[in-house]
Amino acid sequence: MRFENLGASASSLALVLGIILSDGATGRAWSAPACGHACLLKVMDGFRASMTAGQPGSVPLAPDAEVRENAHPVMLAGTAWKRVKSVRSVMTFADPVTGNVVSRAGVELDDGKPGYISTRLKVAGGGRITDVELSTDTSSRVVGSYVWSLDPQFEAVLPPEQRLSRVDLEALGRRYFHSLSSHQAVADDFDAACNRFHSGQQITNVARNAVEGGPPRTCASSLEGTPPWGPATEQRFPVVDAERGIVFGVTLLHYPKVPKQPRMYVSEVFKVVGGRIVKIDNIGLMMEGVESLGFTH
């Protein structure tokens, strides 16, 4: 047996392994996802169980976790979850590519009234949570019949021919948020029967609505005209689920023409079937004095 080329052979083997374990397009070292789809769902289930049991201390937060509710830094023990008597309905979407999972929970509060809580978790290795982003509506605007019986259509898996790619889904979401600034909708992005709901209140295809007022409108026409909002800044799309046709997006919507110039924290789940938006689930919270939604790391 000859050993004089062993060092070179070992180096070559290491190089080959390095190529195999690298991303040829980016040069980044390959690694398995910190938390897959089932893992992300399990982390969210555990979070919800801990919070409804009044045990926020059992949530596996990372040491430097960022926790916010309605854009404000908070301690978990001080969030609206402490008021939750029971979770009546929930839908959850996970994205192993980004490590994010989001749930919408229609809850019964301690006074018997309905509430709507959106929870986004960013999950790192070992199931540690680095982000907790809560968008919480406990106002009288929440429609119990909607949030306590969330539409199963959102979680339904689409047949392959009705799906868009991740890239196309995110692009659709970005066009929608751009329309909030330009007031020019892309009509082809919407199904003819598309509807938008704010904490359960139907905004589109009704004679009138108590949220935006004005004449009847569609998903597309509701973005047009001369609305008091725009621009939409801090746009993020933490969860994209191509299998279910889901895009979860967040943006800070400015109202520069309104006294005190409030801003709306917009948290939306888009259901996309056959390349068109069929339903939009929104939690829109008007706030004053908020400069940023956070999570800029």
Please give the residue ranges for each predicted region.
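Bacterial N-terminal signal peptides
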Residues: A10-G24
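Bacterial N-terminal signal peptides that target proteins for export
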Residues: M1-L13
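C-terminal and inter-domain tail/linker signature
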Residues: G27-H297
